[in-house]
Amino acid sequence: MTEANKTTINDAQKIAGSDPREAGTQLRPGLWPTINERYPGSMITKETSVPLAPLTKPLNQARLVMISSCGVHRKIDRPLDVCHPFGDFGFRRVPSNAKPAELTIHQLKYPHDDADIDINVAFPIERLQELAAEGTLGGLTPNFFSFIGYNMDPERFERTVAHDIAEAVVVEEKADVALLVPA
């Protein structure tokens, strides 16, 4: 970024004559203080909290599923759509016994250079396999789940992707506990 392109909140405030954090105020063309100001309604805010489900058995007897927003998938699977302006409303199943060399991250919304070297940085599949093998975990579900966290219609995401993953985790995978891994 060149010196001429750097704009601070204070600089923008001096130029605009108002607080640039006010809704609808751009710092400069294409730069908004928050994503919700650029795309109103893009953030889910809830008045109620979701109660945690108590663990009903010891972890060394529990079957774990991993759910990640990093966009990982097997190289042989169709990648998630990273070009659609509203995001992808799908997800990928990743076999829990997959090898890192079989996996890739197809994602443009965050840097994943380190995860390209070691997938466990964003999707700790080998660490979970090790914990299951040593008996710290009772086991792993046959599949883990991954989706793209970038999504501009969170209510649709909640109704579709989140609902479909939750149903698969409970009905098909029969998970006792879920590890949520944000990217």
Question: What positions do the PLM features span?
Answer:
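Metallocofactor- and cofactor-centric catalytic cores in central/energy metabolism, strongly enriched
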Residues: 2-183
